[in-house]
């Protein structure tokens, strides 16, 4: 969005989201916590806005990486904490998508990591409003792990090192793709600890859009959700909603 357009002025954009968190204080995981976190989000509907065609101004949820759920999808990931994952928005055009993936692979491998798997995130494309559907990107989940020959650190050291590398990789990818002007590209998250599901949705649409979130084998112990404050900024499908810092 331009710095100034009509009555809109970017100088007045700021975060004032409705946020919530659900935690199992005993550390246990369950799908019930996913359901409860989504209920918290849905109860913040008054914090957001939507158009006549039911296009929302953004909503999202951040949870721990559901390691067991990922294994059940047949994805051969390493041990918990020894790989990173994240949801990525990609353009639907195959040529642009391949260009972005090549850049991602280059930057991932620069840090001794490898893109080990690319998963199509199951979504219900009938859920978002008309305007959101018109700009909907391809939604993928990437899995990144250290190259086997370089994975020699202890589990604790590797987790800290991997998280730092994933942050650097994400920033380098974003810097390289930004000048290309590809609006439909966005990395929702890239971490060895947490994963973010978000988009240009209402708080009530998130659950129905991302089918992972209603899978009974998707278990978490902590969930944080966000619903932007009405009229605080102009929404875009790529960015969706803002979210709190990473969960502990």
Stretches with model-predicted labels:
Residues 1-247:
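N-terminal segments that mediate ammonia production and transfer
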